[in-house]
């Protein structure tokens, strides 16, 4: 991955420009899409039709040159394509008007393909009991703002607290963990970022370095199968920013990560009975990203 392929780089640039210009031109929400030119909506790893008609399923597409770059290290081969994603929209009803209203207020999230359900709310008064509810949206709207929203000047002595919840796609992998990605504008005018592991499946404990051990791996590459014997079908947590500085503009978004499952290349190798080169990944960890919640100092 290249630095500016991450949405957080644009989000951080937005904070910096807002400090300079008084407006944030990169205050955007997140959605996922197929990014394909085939008119095919399929995004499943076992049903990947490629990005255009020249790379539809066939035994050699994994080694086709999709984009030839002057510098060979930036040339994109067929196996480097990723199957598309979906847009999740929290609309009040299933109408064109309500869906576009939700998109306008950025109450949206992206997935890399699975149909996960993800909720993300920020506020000043959430507590641990709120993470025990079966209706996170009810407490989220009552005490905070949803994904895409804004938190204004912090009450004295308080740090922003978030409710984040995710439910797995019933046809996909269990959930590995939920992370919150934070970006902020430092005192020196430069932007910074940090990724926090907030809640996870299984009996794991962060190490001395603060990093959470991997969830494990049940993928059988030869058969292109996996088992949901690790991870969790749903996760929910209440999290407070431990590094909050009320004077610094910031954004927060949630990232939900699945356990490892077979990548489209594994399905293709099985389907056509072929062997790909050793550098071709056969596994993936699907994920979802919410629109951010922004904090603006008074």
Kindly give the residue locations of the regions a language model identified:
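C-terminal functional module detector
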Residues: 1-298
